[in-house]
């Protein structure tokens, strides 16, 4: 489950910025807006920035968590099952957000959803029982899996 701090939507991001040394109000407002836009959340909540982030839907909380992470310009963003427990509408919103950000950020996404990996990943690291079995580009993985466990999983897609 994505974590939304008990603060307002706006403060969920400004808290991180202040922690990282950004104090000027105009700069905080600008970065907050930009990151919410990058996470494709701003248009949905722009009139509710002072409201509690706890009232957001699961998908909105996930996009808020992504926006919060983007505030500090990470080299790598680690997402663990970013769409688990989300409905299809919010899953699509998260995937579209990640695809839009793909060229600007490096993502490491842990997922059991191979169809999702096929839609959004450039590279696949396939693991089974804690062991890495394959490391390859997405097209090769799905067209010519080299391990039996991968072939078994792909056949059920």
Language model segments and positions:
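Conserved ABC ATPase signature
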Residues: 51-56, 60
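Helical segment within the ABC ATPase nucleotide-binding domain
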Residues: 91-103
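C-terminal boundary and immediately downstream tail of ABC-type ATPase nucleotide-binding domains
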Residues: 139-157
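Catalytic Walker B motif of ABC-type/P-loop ATPase nucleotide-binding domains
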Residues: 77-80
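Conserved catalytic motifs of ABC-family nucleotide-binding domains
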Residues: 73
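Conserved ABC ATPase "signature" region
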Residues: 26-46
């Amino acid at each position: 489950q994505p974590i939304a701090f008990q603060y307002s939507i706006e403060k969920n991001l400004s808290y991180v910025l202040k922690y990282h040394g950004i104090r000027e109000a105009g700069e905080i407002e600008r970065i907050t807006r930009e990151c919410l836009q990058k996470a494709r959340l701003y248009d949905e909540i722009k009139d509710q920035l002072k409201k509690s982030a706890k009232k957001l839907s699961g998908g909105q909380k996930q996009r808020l968590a992504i926006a919060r992470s983007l505030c500090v310009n990470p080299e790598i963003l680690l997402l663990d099952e970013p769409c688990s427990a989300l409905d299809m509408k919010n899953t699509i919103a998260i995937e579209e957000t990640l695809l839009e950000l793909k060229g600007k950020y490096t993502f490491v996404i842990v997922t059991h959803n191979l169809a999702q990996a096929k839609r959004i990943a450039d590279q696949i690291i396939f693991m089974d029982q804690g062991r890495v079995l394959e490391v390859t580009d997405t097209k090769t993985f799905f067209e010519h899996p080299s391990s039996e466990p991968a072939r078994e999983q792909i056949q059920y897609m």
